From Swiss-Prot:
Subunit relationships: Fourteen ClpP subunits assemble into 2 heptameric rings which stack back to back to give a disk-like structure with a central cavity, resembling the structure of eukaryotic proteasomes.
Annotated catalysed reactions: Hydrolysis of proteins to small peptides in the presence of ATP and magnesium. alpha-casein is the usual test substrate. In the absence of ATP, only oligopeptides shorter than five residues are hydrolyzed (such as succinyl-Leu-Tyr-|-NHMec, and Leu-Tyr-Leu-|-Tyr-Trp, in which cleavage of the -Tyr-|-Leu- and -Tyr-|-Trp bonds also occurs)
Pfam assignment, any one: CLP_protease
Domain of life where this protein originates: Bacteria
Record-listed E.C. numbers: 3.4.21.92
Species whose genome carries this gene: Bacteroides thetaiotaomicron (strain ATCC 29148 / DSM 2079 / JCM 5827 / CCUG 10774 / NCTC 10582 / VPI-5482 / E50)
Catalytic residues (UniProt): 125, 150
Protein name: ATP-dependent Clp protease proteolytic subunit
Protein task: Cleaves peptides in various proteins in a process that requires ATP hydrolysis. Has a chymotrypsin-like activity. Plays a major role in the degradation of misfolded proteins.
Main localisation: cytoplasm
One Gene Ontology cellular component: cytoplasm
Length: 220
C-alpha cells in the first residue's frame, strides 16, 4: 500500500491527504471502485458508474422490474446528454420478466442513440430478445457465449375463466416476442415459432448464422 501511495502522489500528482482518507475507508475491502483526481477535486465511483460515463451499461442479472427501471433510466439519461451517440449494453443474463424486458426493448427503440448489444456469457430468454434488438450491425457476442430462445412461461390458478384470460395473454406475448426476434434477425417467423417451442441453444457462431448477432468478437 505504501508503494501505491508513493506512486499515486509522486508520479500521478494525487493529493496525499485525500488519498489517505480513501485508503483508510477501504481498508480490508476489495471493492470495484475507481479513484480519479480532476482539476478541482477527487471523485470516487464504482466501476459500473465509471463505465456508464463512457456510455457502457451492464445487464448482468435476471431481468426484473428494478433492473428494467435502472436500465431504462440509464438509456434515457445517456441519450439526453448526447443524443445520437452510441450506447453499449453488455449482456450476461438468464432472462426474466417479459413485461420488464419489453419496457427495456421499447426504450431501446425509442431513443435516438443506436444501442449496441454485446453478449459476454449468456443471453437467454428475454435477454436474447434484448440482444437481437440492438442496432443492426452493432450486435455481437464473445466466442464462448450462449444464446437461448424459448416460448414465454407462465402459470395460472383460480376459476377456469381466469385461467383462460392468462392463457390468452401468454399467447399474445408469445406472438409479440417471436415477431421481435423474426424482425430483428430477419429469420422466418414460422421458424422462430418452431425453434422456440423448447429451449433452443446457440453458440456465438450459430447465433450469428441465425441473425441474432452480427459479429463474433475475437479480440478488441
Amino acid at each position: 500500500m505504501d508503494d501505491f501511495r508513493k506512486y499515486a502522489t509522486k508520479h500521478l500528482g494525487m493529493n496525499g491527504m485525500v488519498l489517505d482518507d480513501v485508503i483508510k475507508s477501504q481498508a480490508g475491502y476489495l471493492n470495484p471502485y475507481i479513484l480519479e483526481e480532476r482539476q478541482l477535486n477527487v471523485t470516487q465511483l464504482d466501476v459500473f458508474s465509471r463505465l456508464m460515463m463512457d456510455r457502457i451499461i451492464f445487464l448482468g442479472t435476471q431481468v426484473d422490474d428494478y433492473t428494467a427501471n435502472t436500465l431504462q433510466a440509464q438509456l434515457l439519461y445517456l441519450d439526453s446528454v448526447d443524443p445520437g451517440k452510441d450506447i453499449s449494453i453488455y449482456i450476461n443474463s438468464p432472462g426474466g420478466s417479459v413485461y420488464a424486458g419489453l419496457g427495456i426493448y421499447d426504450t431501446m427503440q425509442f431513443i435516438s442513440s443506436d444501442v449496441a448489444t454485446i453478449c459476454t456469457g449468456m443471453a437467454a430468454s428475454m435477454a436474447a430478445v434484448l440482444l437481437v434488438a440492438g442496432a443492426e450491425g452493432k450486435r455481437s457476442a464473445l466466442p464462448h457465449s450462449r444464446v437461448m430462445i424459448h416460448q414465454p412461461m407462465g402459470g395460472a390458478q383460480g376459476q377456469a375463466s381466469d385461467i383462460e384470460i392468462t392463457a390468452r395473454e401468454i399467447q399474445k406475448l408469445k406472438k409479440e416476442l417471436y415477431t421481435i426476434i423474426a424482425d430483428h434477425s430477419h429469420t422466418d417467423f414460422d421458424k422462430v415459432w418452431a425453434d422456440s417451442d423448447r429451449d433452443y441453444w446457440m453458440t456465438a457462431q450459430e447465433a450469428k448464422e441465425y441473425g441474432m448477432i452480427d459479429e463474433v468478437l475475437i479480440k478488441k
